[in-house]
Structure formats: structure tokens, C-alpha cells
UniProtKB/Swiss-Prot annotation:
The keyword Metal-binding applies. Ca(2+) 2 binds at residues 57, 59, 61, 63, 68. Ca(2+) 1 binds at residues 21, 23, 25, 27, 32. Ca(2+) 4 binds at residues 130, 132, 134, 136, 141. Belongs to the calmodulin family. GO terms for molecular function: calcium ion binding; enzyme regulator activity. Residues 8-43, 44-79, 81-116, 117-149 form the EF-hand domain. Keywords: Acetylation, Calcium, Metal-binding, Methylation, Repeat. This is Calmodulin-2. It comes from the Eukaryota. GO terms for cellular component: cytoplasm.
């Protein structure tokens, strides 16, 4: 599960994890888990936290190490990709609402997100997602890419 995270996500999670690993022993207590997840934009309920902790804390010692934490976050992030959120995200990229994301639309959104990409990088992103080879991304291709991350 954690192998589907990007290096950037892993670095971000490591940073957050370290903030709460007060004594630097590589473990955080179950109490701290909620705080860590909230700092990363997740909003788990108490019941969800308890379930996650029970799932992850195999030996029941009340602490979670970094590999366990990564698996937890990867699972949590996958769960948040609901159909409705994917449709909304696709609409954001598909500026002219023609049902396709073009290289220009992709570049526009990425620039607005603060990502300065070269034409080559944008073309590469399109190529990776463009299953039918028409030079743009349709909704099915978009969903495939989003679910694979």
C-alpha cells in the first residue's frame, strides 16, 4: 500500500511523523495519531482513529512506527478518492467542459497549483494517462490514473 505513495508524499508524512515523535525513538503514541493526521488535512473521528490504531498496532503496545504510519496514510488517502471527488477534479481540469483534458488545460491547472512544468513534462503526463492515444485524457483515463496513485 505505502509503495503507491510518491517520494514527495513520503517526505511530507515523515516530516509530520517526526514532529510528533517527541523522543525520536521512531514511534508515536496512539494519542498523537489524531493530531498527526489532522496536520496532514485528514479529519478522522474518534471511532475511526480507534479502528485505525487497532488495525496498525499489531502488538498492542500503544505506539505506531513509521512504516505502519505510512500504510495507514496510504490506505486513508485511497479511501478519500470517492467517485464524486474524482468527477469534481476532472471538471476542474476540463476547462471547456468538452469531456477531455488537453495538454493546454493540464498545463493551466498545474500552473495555478504552483507547478511550473515544461512542455515535455506536460506531454509526458498526458502520454502516461492517454490510454487510447488521442493526445488528451478522457474521464475513464483520468480515473485510472487517480486510482493508481
Amino acid at each position: 500500500m505505502a509503495d503507491q505513495l510518491t517520494d514527495e508524499q513520503i517526505a511530507e508524512f515523515k516530516e509530520a511523523f517526526s514532529l510528533f515523535d517527541k523522543d525520536g525513538d521512531g514511534c508515536i503514541t496512539t494519542k498523537e495519531l489524531g493530531t498527526v493526521m489532522r496536520s496532514l488535512g485528514q479529519n478522522p473521528t474518534e471511532a475511526e482513529l480507534q479502528d485505525m490504531i487497532n488495525e496498525v498496532d499489531a502488538d498492542g503496545n500503544g505506539t505506531i512506527d513509521f512504516p505502519e504510519f505510512l500504510n495507514l496514510m496510504a490506505k486513508k488517502m485511497k479511501d478519500t478518492d470517492s467517485e464524486e471527488e474524482l468527477k469534481e477534479a476532472f471538471r476542474v481540469f476540463d476547462k471547456d467542459q468538452n469531456g477531455f483534458i488537453s495538454a493546454a488545460e493540464l498545463r493551466h491547472v498545474m500552473t495555478n497549483l504552483g507547478e511550473k512544468l515544461t512542455d515535455e513534462e506536460v506531454d509526458e503526463m498526458i502520454r502516461e494517462a492517454d490510454v487510447d492515444g488521442d493526445g488528451q485524457i478522457n474521464y475513464e483515463e483520468f480515473v485510472k490514473v487517480m486510482m493508481a496513485k
